[in-house]
């Protein structure tokens, strides 16, 4: 048991094209239905693909036969495909923390089909809401001529993936109980004292 942590050094070009570029200037606005803010630059997409391959190359030697791999968010959509190409056979899950865009918006993305096809290398894909899962399913039905079963097994691109809705958030009752506890009150007082006369943002 335990957690193994590995760091990946990225070149400034990778940070600019992958993270600041494709992830946050292309996918993030597009997935939040802001086509007006979406930047389409070829170098961004190339950096996104290159950096995800790099992540897969670093992760692959660390994977044990019984490991389950869980990948999070739009920054790493192609990573399961890249791991599979390196011979990884483990179960791989993915959870998207953002909305999934309507098909009419997603098709504005150059190589949108390649991005969605890469998701079919996961074994399980999770969405926050039924609406976002439905938008994903609709894209696959129309753009990839895929089939969707009532239990959200989706077949397309010669592969199949199980999808589901898994809303996440904080334990509100537990959070409120902690706030109202003696320790919570002491913590609040300590934080308030340390913030005295300071601007908080």
Regions found by a protein language model. Give the residues of each.
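Catalytic cores of carbohydrate-active enzymes across secretory and cytosolic contexts
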Residues: 1-201
């Amino acid at each position: 048991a335990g957690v193994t942590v590995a760091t990946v050094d990225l070149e400034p070009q990778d940070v600019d094209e992958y993270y600041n570029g494709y992830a946050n200037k292309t996918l993030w606005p597009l997935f939040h239905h802001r086509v007006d803010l979406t930047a389409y630059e070829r170098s961004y997409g190339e950096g996104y693909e290159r950096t995800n391959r790099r992540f897969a190359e670093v992760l692959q030697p660390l994977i044990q036969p019984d490991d389950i791999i869980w990948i999070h968010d739009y920054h790493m959509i192609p990573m399961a495909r890249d791991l599979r190409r390196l011979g990884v056979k483990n179960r791989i899950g993915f959870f998207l923390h953002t909305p999934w865009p309507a098909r009419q918006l997603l098709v504005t993305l150059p190589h949108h089909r390649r991005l969605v096809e890469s998701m079919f290398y996961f074994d399980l894909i999770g969405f926050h809401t039924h609406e976002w899962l439905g938008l994903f399913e609709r894209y696959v039905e129309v753009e990839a001529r895929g089939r969707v079963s009532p239990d959200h097994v989706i077949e397309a691109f010669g592969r199949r993936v199980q999808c589901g809705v898994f809303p996440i958030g904080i334990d509100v009752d537990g959070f409120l109980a902690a706030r109202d506890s003696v320790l919570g009150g002491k913590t609040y007082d300590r934080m308030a004292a340390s913030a005295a006369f300071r601007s908080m943002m």
